[in-house]
């Protein structure tokens, strides 16, 4: 591997909460360039009891989202960690909204396409109005944990992305 290979950047198609600049800036610790794009052949679902969206293949599906361009390996690792094992990062083809150019990018697809918790259609504006603050709080805690785990497990922080996590009596 040459030194130039190490500096390859990543382009990632995002949908759901990662379309919100304040969320992306927090997770990536920078303000990446965001380019509007569409992903054909997928549907963006709600997840029962969760604050975030997921996508799964759907023959006639169309998702409007954004491409985060020029991400570093470290930034991609942040996305991988926050998405966790319930998502699979895969290469897809998107169409740039402004130019109709096709582009190969990576995105996060829900690993269990038959998950009974998938339903309906996730709504960005509704999420922004009702859940964004809680999601930003959870993301902040996750980034703090990544920097200093202090013996705590990732699972302790996963509960923050639930709409109404169980509480102790």
UniProtKB/Swiss-Prot annotation:
**Enzyme Commission number(s) from the entry:** 2.3.2.-
Q: What is this protein called?
A: Protein AIG2 B
**Stimuli inducing this protein:** Up-regulated by biotic and chemical treatments.
Name the InterPro entries on file. AIG2-like (IPR045038), AIG2-like_dom (IPR009288), GGCT-like (IPR013024), GGCT-like_sf (IPR036568)
Entry-linked Gene3D superfamilies:
6.10.250.210, Gamma-glutamyl cyclotransferase-like
What superkingdom heads the lineage? Eukaryota
Q: Which organism is it from?
A: Arabidopsis thaliana (Mouse-ear cress)
Function of the protein: Putative gamma-glutamylcyclotransferase.
Main EC class of this protein?
transferase
Q: Which UniProt keywords apply?
A: Acyltransferase, Transferase
